[in-house]
């Protein structure tokens, strides 16, 4: 069967060789305002939108996620579990003509899998790249992006509740003592959240989201040059 590769609103016929994968986390507390699967929903939104704008294939989501041992705000897997899931997606992607894989990651802990990307390239003879788009956990940026895509319950009462760091220690990781002690960047972000709190800024959310989508689109363009 000869496929009409030039049909539709696509950048170039070569874009059919690019597959976009969303990576995040399904089981993490995000305060009172955001759902436990915030990271994967944001990653999926960005990845799918970029696929629509470019014509690249959206290959779906990775279900496992991982995290640094000292960050305790959810239920996670080993980095190897993500690696094995990616092996499955890449193997199936190759069957439909994908030669270049772009992972859109919106969960900081998943950075731990970067060490496996070269192994995947070598095993399957493909290109594998990852874009990391991360925010201070459940803080202003993530709440604002979540609101824009429709997953945040950001009324005044919920936001006030969200800023109760004793009840929701994961917000900004303010109350995650072990994480703050082991990671200077986390501690600095937590201090900022303690000082300024968490607020909703729709304009900020739109800008962050649009910039993230543009970043993925630009990477797809680079991959088909």
From Swiss-Prot:
Cofactor info, note text: Requires one Fe(2+) ion for activity. Requires an additional second metal ion that could be Fe(2+) or Zn(2+).
EC number: 3.5.1.102
Lineage top rank: taxon: Archaea
Cofactor(s) of this protein: Fe(2+); Zn(2+)
Catalytic activity: 2-amino-5-formylamino-6-(5-phospho-D-ribosylamino)pyrimidin-4(3H)-one + H2O = 2,5-diamino-6-(1-D-ribosylamino)pyrimidin-4(3H)-one 5'-phosphate + formate + H(+)
GO molecular-function terms, A-Z: 2-amino-5-formylamino-6-(5-phosphoribosylamino)pyrimidin-4(3H)-one formate-lyase activity; ferrous iron binding
GO biological process entries: F420-0 metabolic process; riboflavin biosynthetic process
Entry keyword set: Hydrolase, Iron, Metal-binding, Zinc
The protein's annotated pathway: Cofactor biosynthesis; coenzyme F420 biosynthesis; Cofactor biosynthesis; riboflavin biosynthesis
Classification via Pfam families: Creatininase
Binding site for Fe cation 1: 28, 39, 107
Binding residues annotated for Fe cation 2, in chain numbering: 30, 39
Family: Belongs to the creatininase superfamily. FAPy deformylase family.
Protein role: Catalyzes the hydrolysis of the formamide of 2-amino-5-formylamino-6-ribosylamino-4(3H)-pyrimidinone 5'-monophosphate (FAPy) to form 2,5-diamino-6-ribosylamino-4(3H)-pyrimidinone 5'-phosphate (APy).
Subunit-structure text: Homodimer.
NCBIfam families assigned to the protein according to its UniProt record, in alphabetical order: ArfB_arch_rifla (NF033501)
Protein name (database record): 2-amino-5-formylamino-6-ribosylaminopyrimidin-4(3H)-one 5'-monophosphate deformylase
Natural source organism: Methanocaldococcus fervens (strain DSM 4213 / JCM 15782 / AG86)
Gene: arfB
């Amino acid at each position: 069967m000869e496929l009409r590769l030039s049909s539709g609103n696509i950048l170039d016929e070569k874009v059919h060789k690019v597959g976009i994968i969303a990576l995040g986390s399904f089981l993490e507390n995000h305060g009172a305002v955001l759902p436990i699967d915030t990271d994967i929903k944001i990653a999926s939104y960005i990845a799918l939108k970029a696929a629509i704008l470019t014509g690249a294939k959206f290959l779906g989501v990775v279900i496992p996620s991982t995290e640094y041992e000292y960050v305790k705000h959810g239920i996670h897997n080993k980095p190897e579990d993500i690696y094995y899931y990616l092996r499955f997606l890449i193997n199936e992607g190759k069957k439909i003509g994908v030669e270049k894989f772009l992972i859109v990651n919106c969960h900081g802990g998943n950075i731990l899998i970067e060490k496996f990307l070269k192994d995947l390239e070598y095993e399957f003879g493909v290109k594998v790249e990852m874009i990391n788009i991360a925010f201070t956990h459940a803080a202003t940026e993530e709440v604002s992006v979540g609101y824009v895509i429709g997953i945040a319950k950001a009324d005044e009462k919920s936001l006030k509740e969200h800023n109760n760091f004793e009840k929701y220690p994961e917000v900004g990781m303010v109350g995650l003592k072990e994480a703050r002690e082991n990671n200077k960047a986390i501690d600095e972000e937590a201090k900022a959240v303690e000082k300024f709190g968490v607020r909703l800024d729709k304009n900020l959310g739109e800008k962050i989201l649009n910039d993230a989508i543009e970043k993925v689109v630009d990477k797809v363009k680079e991959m088909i040059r």
